[in-house]
Amino acid sequence: IARYTARDATFNGFEAKFSYAFFDSGSNRASVSVFGDLVKAEFDNGENVPRIPPSKIGAEVRFSGAEWTGHVHVTRHGEQDDPGRLELATPEYTLLSAYADYHIGLGRDSELKLFIRGDNLLDEEVRTHSSLLKDFSPESGRAISLGLRFEL
């Protein structure tokens, strides 16, 4: 049983993203993005607010052509070393993911997509600080999926 109550708190932080399309020729495009965020939160009595995610910084490269798209995405999640009362700190980790698909047109309004997707490719132990289950169960490890998607 848990009891949740509202308390006065101050949140400070930022979020930023910069994207740049470095190649654009006909149906072929490529871009890069960098991003990051940071949140600090304290109750008015000076205690840390619980389940505040740590800072993160990352980058993504996206590319596409007439019949294909893809991206590679890396995000560094910092250590959460300012946990709230009754919380444990969370270690830092890096997530690397990739995705690519190939489009096969099946007429005027439908297509088939063949895709491959990889998540947590570095097989990091991920404990999402904002999760109530972080101390009991990490997120899933490396996952690679092959698939087929039909779109109308």
Question: Language-model segments: which ranges?
Answer:
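Flexible, surface-exposed loop regions and adjacent strand-edge segments
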Residues: 1, 48-53, 78, 87-91, ...
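Gram-negative outer-membrane beta-barrel transporters
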Residues: 2-80
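Residue-level preference for beta-strand/loop junctions
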Residues: 10, 28, 53, 92-94, ...
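Hydrophobic, lipid-facing positions within transmembrane beta-strands of outer-membrane proteins
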Residues: 12-16, 55-59, 94-100, 142-148
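Short regulatory "switch" loops immediately downstream of catalytic or recognition motifs
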Residues: 19-23, 101-106
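C-terminal beta-signal and adjacent terminal beta-strands/loops
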Residues: 79-81, 102-152
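Short, glycine/charged-rich beta-strand-loop motifs at protein surfaces that mediate ligand recognition
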Residues: 83-90, 100-103
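Outer-membrane beta-barrel transmembrane domain signature
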Residues: 88-95, 152
